[in-house]
Structures are given as C-alpha cells and as structure tokens.
From Swiss-Prot:
Function: DNA-binding protein which may repress cyclin D1 transcription by recruiting HDAC1 to its promoter, thereby diminishing H3K9ac, H3S10ph and H4K8ac levels. Promotes TP53 activation, which causes cell cycle arrest.
Region (Disordered): 132-153, 168-198, 326-350
Protein name, as recorded: Protein BANP
Coiled-coil spans in chain: 65-90
InterPro entries: BANP (IPR042343), BEN_domain (IPR018379)
Gene3D superfamilies, A to Z: BEN domain
Length: 508
C-alpha cells in the first residue's frame, strides 16, 4: 500500500491538473466572448452605412421630383407670359402691317421716286431681313443659343451678309415737354446708353445697289460698310467740312433722308404721333462711318442718336407750323441724279441751268443800286457782288438793306448797309417785292408791299422757258403787276397777318 505521503502528492497533482484545465477553459471562454462582440459590431457598422446610403438616395429623389415640378410650373408660366405678350402686342398694334419708310436717292429737294429702290424695311419687333427674305420672325430670342441659330440660318444664304443691329424702342418722352421753341431741342450730353434687348437683323447692301454712290464706314471691311446714294463729290464735301462726329451725323442725315421724311420719322418708329422708322440700314451706315472716321464710343453714339431724334422732332414742329423744311446747305445745290417726269435727266437740266445764269431779284421800291447774292457763309453773313441782279430802291438816306439766313435755311430781309467790299450788316426790316430774271437788264419801278417784315422761306430756281410769267401776290396791285418785267414765275404768298411772304417756285 502506498504511504500517506504518496497519496498527498497524487492529490496535489490532480488538483493542479484541474486548476490548469479550468484556467484554459476561462481563457477559451474569454476569447469567445471577445470575438463575438467584435463580429456583432462589424455587422452593426455595415447596416448603418446601408441605411445612410438609402436615406441619401431617397432625399435626392425627392429633390429631383421637386425640381421637375418647379420646371414644369415655370414652363407653364412662360407659355402664359408669352401669350400675354402676344395679346398685348396685338392690342398695341405692333403686329400689324410693316412700317415702310421711303429712302432718299441723295437729292436734297425731295424723297426717292417710285423707280428708286427701298433697301430695308423692318417692323418694330425683332425680325430677320436677309437676301432671300426669311419667312420666319422671332419676336424675342430668349438665349444666346437661339440668336446664334438665327444667324446660322440667315448668314451665308446669299452673297450679302447679315448684321445684328440694336434698334432703340424708347418712346418720345420729350414730345410732351415740347413748347415749340427751337431751344427745347438741346440734347443733354450726360445721357448713358440704356439697356435694350431689341435686336433687328438686317442685310448689308452692295455696290450694285448704288453704283454712283459711296461707302459709309470702312470700305475694306464688308461688315462695317453700307452703300449709300451720296455722290463722291458730296461725300468729299461732308468729310472736309464736318469736323465733329455729331455734325457729320446730322449732315449725313440730311443727305440720306429728306426733311419731309425726318418730320414724320424717328429712330425707333414709335411715339404718340405715329411716326415711322428711319431706314435702319442707313442709320447703321452712319454709325459705321462715325466709328471709322472719329473712333467714337458707344456712349458718344448714344448722344448722337439723341441729336438725330431731336433733329427729327425739330422738323416735325416746323412742319406743324407750316414753316420751310429746306436745308440751308442745299439751297444752291442741284441733285446729282434725279429722274424727271418727262424722262430728261437732272444732269442735262443742270447743264442747261449752268449755261443760263439766273438771279433772284429783291426789289425795294425804286432802286438804282444792284447787288447779287453770291454766297451765304456759315456765320449767316451774305456776301454779294456789285453789278448783280438784286435791285434795291427807294431806300431813305441813312438806311440800308441786308438778306440773312437763319440756322434752318430761311432767308430774311433787313435794313443793312452794303459796303464797297460786298459785305452787309443787319439792321431792321424793310418793305419788299421780289422778281426773278435770267439777266440783269431791265429795272424795277414799283411800289413796295405792305408787309413790314418779309421772310423768304424757300427759293428754288429752275430753267426759264417762259418769259411771260406773272407774279402772283395778294398784296400787289394790278398796276404793279403790269409794270414788272418778269422772266420767271414766282409765287408770293402773304400770310393772314400781312407780315410774312413766302416765295416759292410753282410745282415745288
């Protein structure tokens, strides 16, 4: 049998083995406990990421749906606004017939005849005018892409080019402020260009349209030039005498548009007086010419456009008052090309007039001194030549006579002194009768008119073919009509107040 000491050792070994197994079991259990929470946390993180992604997707879908709904509402609103604009245009009469403005063939004495060509006619909305006459009209291009599409559809169809031109549409605000005074036409130089989205597409013309004309703008740049009916001689005269951009613009306006056309037109073609629109092609030509000659800015061009509108308003007021619309610089100018009713060209008529020198006689009862109008300077002074055909008579000693011309081209008769050098000085108005003749022979012995202040509004002398014409004047007596040696018929129309007489050629 085993001793007691051996049994104790066996028991200790067994207890030690049991403790060792228990420790291993604890370690395994601890390891299992530590692994299981780790796996659970990983599963929890994966589920949270999935839920966040799904939430973001749902939010994105909701936002897209709302944006689609807003876009649909905006489209409906746009269609509604477009319909309202069309109805408003219909009410305002903007979609009626095209506004047509006759062009001037360069003649200072009248508008273009029926045989001349009208280059460009545009309505008041955004339009396309191309060489083959586009069939569609765009009332309001919404984006730059649509404008580029319009240009691509029109440019390149013919040999001519289409240019984008902004046309002003502002109303004539100053019409309500006009008092009839000429000083009301002063233009403020502090104006700035206004934002204007109205765009007109026009087609530039070519040299074939006006073979005897000239180019406005840079003739070497096809996009910055316009062919106009102004003759090379007139264009040289304009370039020589016009030292500022504004003066050149207003001078070109007189050459391109007759004053009668200016009186019923403006740049926009709008206003309470129902005015027409000046030809945008020629207005663009003036713009190109000023940019080329003077290198002006857009601000300068805006002020010049104001001056052009002001000039048109001045012509309109003068027309309303019945005053002359004659241009001062054109008073002694013969049109270069103008067809007459009987087929005789203006060049032949000009040659006949040159060969037969004419003079207008201003007779101041019983004169012995004769002077002839030679030239009216820019300062308004009249330079005269002695031994001419201006008969001055019955002027009391110490009194004198002069003929002056105002800024609008009106000739006025005053008491003046005629010096030895041919210069005259203004004093006060005399009494006047007027006779026209082709020669300086034959004096005038007649009594004066009853008018105290005579204003010659418009005088144009033509070829004399009838030497038996009569002077028609209500204030002249029959005896006076019999005594006057008249070589050319002139109408003397005396106003109701008996103070103004208008002298005009028959048929003018």
């Amino acid at each position: 049998m085993m001793s007691e000491q051996g049994l104790v050792e066996i028991v200790q070994i067994a207890v030690a083995d049991l403790n060792h197994e228990g420790h291993q079991t604890d370690v395994l259990e601890n390891n299992e406990d530590s692994d299981q929470p780790g796996r659970k946390r990983a599963r929890i993180e994966i589920s949270q990421e999935t839920s966040i992604k799904s939430m973001l997707i749902s939010i994105s879908q909701a936002i897209c749906q709302r944006l689609d709904s807003m876009e649909a509402k905006l489209q409906v609103l746009e269609v509604t606004c477009r319909g309202l604009v069309e109805k408003l245009d219909t009410v305002m009469g903007k979609n009626q017939s095209t506004t047509q403005v006759p062009m001037v063939s360069g003649s200072p004495f009248g508008a273009t005849q029926t045989c001349d060509k009208v280059r460009c006619v545009v309505p008041q909305t955004n339009v396309i005018v191309s060489g083959d006459r586009a069939k569609t009209e765009e009332t309001s291009p919404r984006t730059s892409d649509s404008l580029e599409n319009l240009l691509s559809n029109t440019v390149g169809r013919g040999r001519q080019k289409t240019i984008v031109l902004k046309v002003p549409v502002q109303e004539e605000i100053q019409d309500d402020q006009e008092s009839g005074s000429e000083t009301s036409d002063s233009v403020s130089n502090s104006g700035q260009p206004q934002n204007n989205n109205n765009v007109t597409l026009i087609t530039l013309n070519s040299e074939e349209d006006y073979p005897t004309g000239t180019w406005l703008g840079d003739e070497n740049n096809p996009e910055m030039r316009v062919r106009c009916p102004v003759s090379p001689a007139d264009m040289l005269h304009i370039s020589t005498n016009c030292r500022t951009a504004e003066k050149m613009a207003l001078t070109l306006l007189d050459y391109l548009f007759h004053r009668e056309v200016q009186a019923v037109s403006n740049l926009s073609g709008q206003g309470k007086h129902g005015k027409k629109q000046l030809d945008p092609l020629m207005i663009y030509g003036i713009r190109c010419h000023l940019f080329f000659k003077f290198a002006i800015t857009e601000s300068d061009w805006y002020r010049i456009k104001q001056s052009i509108d002001s000039k048109c308003r001045t012509a309109w007021r003068r027309k309303q008052r019945g005053q002359s619309l004659a241009v001062k610089s054109f008073s002694r100018r013969t049109p270069a090309s103008q067809s007459s009713s009987d087929g005789v060209s203006a060049a032949e008529t000009s040659a006949i007039e040159t060969s037969t020198q004419q003079a207008l006689h201003y007779a101041l009862a019983g004169a012995t001194q004769q002077v002839q109008i030679h030239r009216i300077g820019e300062d308004g002074q009249v330079q005269v030549i002695p031994q001419g055909h201006l008969h001055i008579a019955q002027v009391p000693q110490g009194e004198q006579v002069q003929i002056t011309q105002d800024s609008e081209g009106n000739l006025q008769i005053h008491q003046v002194h005629v010096g030895q050098d041919g210069q005259v000085n203004v004093l006060r108005g005399p009494q006047l009768i007027a006779v026209a003749s082709t020669d300086g022979t034959g004096g005038v012995d007649a009594s004066p008119l009853q008018a105290n202040d005579i204003q010659v509004q418009y005088v144009q002398l033509g070829t004399v073919t009838d030497h038996t014409g009569a002077v028609q004047a209500e204030a002249l007596t029959p005896a006076l009509q019999a005594e006057m040696d008249v070589k050319e018929a002139i109408q003397l129309q005396q106003a109701e107040n008996g103070e103004v007489v208008q002298i005009q050629m028959p048929g003018t």
